[in-house]
Amino acid sequence: MRTGVRLGIDVGKARIGIARSDPHGMLATPVETVTRDAAGTSDLARIVAIAQELDACEAVVGLPLNLRGAATPSTDDASGFAERLAARLAPLGIAVRLVDERLSTVSAQGQLRQAGKKTKQSRAIIDQAAAVVILQHALDIERASGAAPGRAAEPEPQSGRADTETDVVQGEDTQ
C-alpha cells in the first residue's frame, strides 16, 4: 500500500465535506466542511490549502452514481469539480481520483443517528462524515487490491488563462 496522507472529498450542492487519512492510509478522519462557491474559486482554493497544510499525496472525490451504477446530474457535477481540482493540484504533484460513493451520505447519516446526533443539526457534520466514508472505502479498496482506487480525474484544460499557477500540461495517468 502506498504511504502518504490522502484527502476524501464529498461534493454537494451547498457544502463540501473533507476528510483525511493517516500517513499510512489506514484510517480516515473528518477535517472540515467547506461552503460550495458558485464561482468555483474559494472552495477549490480552500481544498488546495488543506492539501498543502496536510502534505497530501492524493485527493479522492466521491462519484455519486445511482444504485444501478448510472450517471446522474450530481455525477456530472462531481466529475467537473474533480477535474477543476485536479487542474489546481497537479502542479503540486497531488493526484485526484474519482471513487464510487453510492450510499455514502446514507451511511454517514445512519452512523450519526446511532451516535445520537439529529440530522437537521448535523448537516455540516454529515458532509464530513460522508467524506470519511468515501475515503475509508477508497483506502480499504487499495489495501485489498494493491491498486489505487477508482479512476484518475483528468485536469480540466485551462483555456486562455494567464494564471501559470493553475496551467497544467496533461499527461498520462501513472497511477
Model-predicted regions and their roles:
Residues R2-L7, K13-Q175:
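Phosphate- and other anionic-substrate recognition elements at nucleic-acid/protein interfaces
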